[in-house]
Amino acid sequence: MYNNARALKPVSERDALKKALYKIKARHNGELKSLKTAWVNFNDAFCDGLEWRTITVVGARPGTGKTLFMEQLVNDVIKMNPDQKFRVLKFQFEMLDETNGIRKLSMNVGSDYNTLMSKGKPIDKGIFQRCVQFYEDTASYDMVDVVYDPCTVEEMCATIHAYMLENKTDEGFTNTLVTIDHSALFKTGGKYKDKFDMLYGLGEALTEMKKKFPVAFLVLSQLNRNVETPERAKDGTYGNYILDSDLYGSDALLQHADVVLGINRPYNRKIKFYGPERYIINNPDLLVFHILKSRNGFMGMTFFKLDRVIMRIVEVDPPPTAS
């Protein structure tokens, strides 16, 4: 009967209320805080920043700056939350460790990749010394660890479990921000026949991990190619916007995520008037963040741009609209 399924033991809902009261009190007393970023509107999509035990999925097409977004976010939360004790565990499947290091140096010294790689002319000695100084400064806050080896979803879970135990203190598990770049690069096989099976398994695994440990997940994902069709690029139409259905394997991750963002770069798609509001697009570095899902915060869209002088993504006011 019931295929020998095990019976689950219900618990009183008062247990949940008790935990809620503890959390409310901890937030009030400042014992529990969100991770604030430099982006006010991004923080508003949450409860004053990234909350622990949440899953955030960020989808974008190649060339829109999603990896820079993630690297800047990690960089900023370390600088802007010095009163919080936490670690960062990055699953970086897409680039070599040295390339990851160059990108981090680029963002922190304000020089682009080609400058650091001496394209056209040798790198300025002052810039190189700033790179060296940044590396030496990281010794005082060595709190970021990276996994570069491709792995399965199960291996990711085992790695997180071991990492949490390794960094456990007498006070308990250490809060950990876990970043994944990107979701489709996990290896398939075993019980996962294809990428879509794997993404469903990933969503379930992330939910299991956030229930078990004080982690916050930031997951980068691709968007489907259909966002680049000529029909979607027609000026002044709703199809210009990123939709939750554009997320690769959308159903698999959407139902598990607490916050879902879609990043768009309208200029790349030759859109001159963005969406029904007809925002005027004349800046190739303008980014539009569509907040597609938010359990506890702001939904809608907000505007950013890549500031190439300082190699950072910065918030900007909405562009003017055409009549």
Show where each model-derived region lies.
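A short beta-strand-to-loop transition that corresponds to the Sensor-1 phosphate-sensing loop
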Residues: 92-95, 182, 215, 219-225, ...
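The Walker A/P-loop phosphate-binding site
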Residues: 4-111
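Alpha-helical scaffold elements adjacent to nucleotide-binding pockets in ATP/GTP-utilizing enzyme cores
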Residues: 73, 99-107, 159, 205, ...
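Hydrophobic/aromatic beta-strand patches that form the interior of the parallel beta-sheet core
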Residues: 56-58, 89-91, 145-147, 218, ...
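C-terminal regions of RecA-like/P-loop NTPase motor modules
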Residues: 9-18, 110, 114-117, 136, ...
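Cytosolic-facing regulatory segments adjacent to core modules
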Residues: 22, 37, 43-45, 80-174, ...
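Flexible beta-alpha connector loops of hexameric P-loop NTPases
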Residues: 116-121, 145-149, 188-198, 231-243
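Helical hairpin unit composed of two closely spaced alpha helices linked by a short loop
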Residues: 89, 174-211, 216
